[in-house]
Amino acid sequence: MSLSDIQQAILSLITNHINADGVSPSQTEIARAFGFKGVRAVQHHLDVLEQQGMIRRVPRQARGIRLKHLTEVDETALALQSEDVLRLPVLGRVAAGQPIGADIGEGRVVLLDRVFFSPAPDYLLRVQGDSMRDEGIFDGDLIGVHRTQDAHSGQIVVARIDDEITVKLLKISKDRIRLLPRNPDFAPIEVRSDQDFAIEGLYCGLLRPNR
């Protein structure tokens, strides 16, 4: 049994609500979002999502819809998900301030609607610091990263300097590469010729957890 378009849309709504606010939407909120007259239709669609292994519901608990972790969802269930739902690992933290170590992983996977990002990201990183504040990127945000080594001057990139990673505005001139903050309280990073420098990916959107 495959998911209908409306069931895929409800799954996306639940996913985005949990990732943004930390809790699932209520059945009344789902009904309102889709123009249902009451929660009975919502309950039917939630029954299907639970049967297909996409969610689980905590009995007698308000906002008790839970997404099943990726490792709990079998391959058949994954195949039934909408192509517009991205399954993205959170690989760790990236500095919007001073570079931080690149070996920090969270070990999480989240489901997100593709519409939040352009181009489609390959993974998420959690921002630490506020050097990109004027680009609307704040401490604690999850940023989508499109994995590529190709970038142009003026793009926001995730870059590796030696064994550290950072998110900055890339500025390439004839004789130097700079990583520019978007906050006047921070100084640009000049990439030296003796440093191991690489572009890890392009910034392609963000998710802001409720806090």
UniProtKB/Swiss-Prot annotation:
Marked site (Cleavage) residue numbers? 96-97
Q: Name one GO molecular function term.
A: serine-type endopeptidase activity
UniProt-listed Gene3D superfamilies = Umud Fragment, subunit A (2.10.109.10), Winged helix-like DNA-binding domain superfamily/Winged helix DNA-binding domain (1.10.10.10)
Please tell me which top-level EC class this enzyme sits in. hydrolase
A Gene Ontology cellular component where this protein is annotated is: protein-DNA complex
User: InterPro entries attached here?
Assistant: LexA (IPR006200), LexA-like (IPR039418), LexA/Signal_pep-like_sf (IPR036286), LexA_DNA-bd_dom (IPR006199), LexA_repressor (IPR050077), Peptidase_S24_LexA (IPR006197), Peptidase_S24_S26A/B/C (IPR015927), WH-like_DNA-bd_sf (IPR036388)
Residues the UniProt record assigns to the DNA-binding region sit at 27-47
Q: Which domain of life is it from?
A: Bacteria
Q: Which UniProt keywords apply?
A: Autocatalytic cleavage, DNA damage, DNA repair, DNA replication, DNA-binding, Hydrolase, Repressor, SOS response, Transcription, Transcription regulation
Q: What is its EC number?
A: 3.4.21.88
What is annotated as the active site?
131, 168
Q: Does the keyword Transcription regulation apply?
A: yes
Q: Look up the coiled coil feature and give its residue ranges.
A: none
Q: Which reaction does it catalyse?
A: Hydrolysis of Ala-|-Gly bond in repressor LexA
GO biological process annotation, one example: negative regulation of DNA-templated transcription
- Describe the family membership recorded for this protein in Swiss-Prot or TrEMBL: Belongs to the peptidase S24 family.
Q: What does this protein do?
A: Represses a number of genes involved in the response to DNA damage (SOS response), including recA and lexA. In the presence of single-stranded DNA, RecA interacts with LexA causing an autocatalytic cleavage which disrupts the DNA-binding part of LexA, leading to derepression of the SOS regulon and eventually DNA repair.
**What is said about its interaction partners and assembly?**
Homodimer.
Know the name of this protein?
LexA repressor
Organism of provenance: Xylella fastidiosa (strain 9a5c)
